[in-house]
A protein has these predicted regions:
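Long, internal scaffold/assembly segments composed of regular secondary structure
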Residues: 375-427
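SAM-dependent methyltransferase catalytic region
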Residues: 1-365, 369-373, 385, 389-402
Length: 427
């Protein structure tokens, strides 16, 4: 489904299905990566939903936080150099723990929320400029798994077996159909490029189809607030019986819940079940990693105010709260910082206090000036990268933040626990 009204001028409503004929028009400029869309449309997405380009260096920084936690050391895949990085070319060495082998790394389940074109999963191009990134320098979570498979297999059959498992462990969802299509294409093209890079041949049709089927399950369309297919409902007819006949029929509309695949157990499961501890007699599936740059806000009014603006509400906090429920490992999200740190904004006081006192909270990286990260204007209260570790063995008393970094020393701030916020200026 389109899942957006952006294509109404082309004759496609949000509830319309994206047909094969439309997909054939991908090259005809019907569906485009965000970098190729008009500046007006980009600004509209930013204004309505707080949707912004996530530069590749930020994706790399967040992905590095995840891998630092997994490996127990820094700079495993690359070294960050400001807004660039230098790829490490030596063979990746794994810890001696049985739970930290290269095969365990491949099977680690990793989800990008509100994935857009999936820049955290695969980095075929710089999302801000559209410039291609050479294969060996890519920084996505799937890119990293492919590198590990390349370094630990010696024949194409074993390689393909573990590439399949790598794809089965990478997930992403988005509400907009055009984003889902582009994300799927990026993952599929990454497989083709990986085969060419490692084995100097193109994959067979059957090899491509098998990967494509996995992608069609693992990159899916979903409304994050209902965990259901956007714009779709089915009718439920309720019939009340009296002594002689049925009467009082009523019809209600119910959303269609989304399902995903648990490949290791070879079964589909409702997304809702991820929130449970147990499901159908077994431990419910949880993600080992959740990462992303969720939407920050949504418009709540159709009419503009006198100053030409529309009322909006914060929504980024809901993505953090839901991620906390379905992850058993690392969560690294980026969203506006000042409004929750200083409890400004409806519904953010409770969220801010709970967040800052969460014993799973490990690190905050704060940029007071959002333009240090994003080129789009409109985020006035700074940007925070928030890292939590939901592993039950990682809890620490007090929920004290280990790092609170700013690129503007004159506006340095830090927070401490105990249910209140304290700003420390120029320390």
């Amino acid at each position: 489904l389109w899942g957006t009204d952006e294509y109404i001028h082309k004759g496609y409503k949000a509830s319309d299905e994206i047909s094969i004929s439309v997909l054939a028009g991908f090259l005809g400029d019907i569906i485009q990566p965000r970098i190729l869309k008009s500046s007006r449309l980009q600004q509209e997405r930013t204004r309505k939903k707080g949707e912004v380009f996530t530069p590749s260096w930020i994706c790399n920084k967040q992905n590095n936080i995840v891998d630092e936690a997994w490996f127990g050391k820094e700079n495993v895949f690359n070294i960050e150099l400001g807004k660039e990085w230098k790829t490490k070319t030596n063979i990746i060495l794994f810890p001696t723990k049985k739970s930290r082998t290269w095969k365990k790394y491949i099977d680690s389940k990793r989800l990008e929320i509100a994935c857009g074109e999936a820049p955290y999963l695969v980095s075929r191009y710089e999302s801000v400029t559209g410039e291609p990134i050479v294969f060996i320098d890519r920084i996505g979570l799937l890119d990293r798994k492919i590198r590990i498979v390349n370094e630990n297999t010696t024949d194409v059959d074993t390689w393909y077996t573990w590439i399949i498992r790598a794809y089965q462990s990478i997930y992403g969802y988005d509400v907009q159909g055009d984003n889902v299509i582009i994300a799927r294409m990026n993952l599929l093209l990454t497989f083709i490029e990986a085969m060419e890079y490692r084995w100097q041949r193109k994959p067979t049709v059957q090899e491509v189809k098998k990967i494509a089927r996995i992608i069609s399950w693992n990159i899916w369309q979903m409304d994050a607030f209902t965990l259901s297919i956007p714009e779709q409902k089915y009718e439920v007819v309720k019939c009340y019986m009296n002594l002689f006949s049925s009467e009082n029929e009523t019809v209600s509309a119910t959303t269609i819940p989304c399902k995903i695949m648990d490949w290791r157990r070879d079964r589909s499961i409702p997304v809702e079940s991820l929130k449970e501890i147990y499901w159908k007699g077994r431990h419910a599936m949880k993600f080992d990693v959740i990462i992303g740059n969720p939407p920050y806000q949504e418009e709540t009014a159709k009419k503009e105010t006198k100053n030409g603006q529309k009322a909006v509400k914060n929504i980024f906090q809901y993505f953090q709260m839901e991620a906390d429920k379905i992850c058993k490992g690392s969560i690294v999200l980026i969203y506006p910082g000042g409004r929750w740190i200083h409890q400004s904004g409806k519904g953010l006081k409770k969220f801010g206090l709970e967040q800052i006192n969460d014993p799973h909270l490990k690190e905050i990286i704060f940029y007071p000036n959002a333009t240090e990260v994003f080129t789009e204007p409109g985020i006035s209260d700074g940007i925070s990268i928030v890292y939590k570790n939901m592993n039950k063995n990682s809890k620490q008393g007090g929920g004290i933040i280990h790092l609170f970094r700013t690129w503007n020393r004159a506006d340095f701030s830090c927070t401490i626990s105990r249910g209140e916020f304290i700003a420390v200026k120029s320390k």
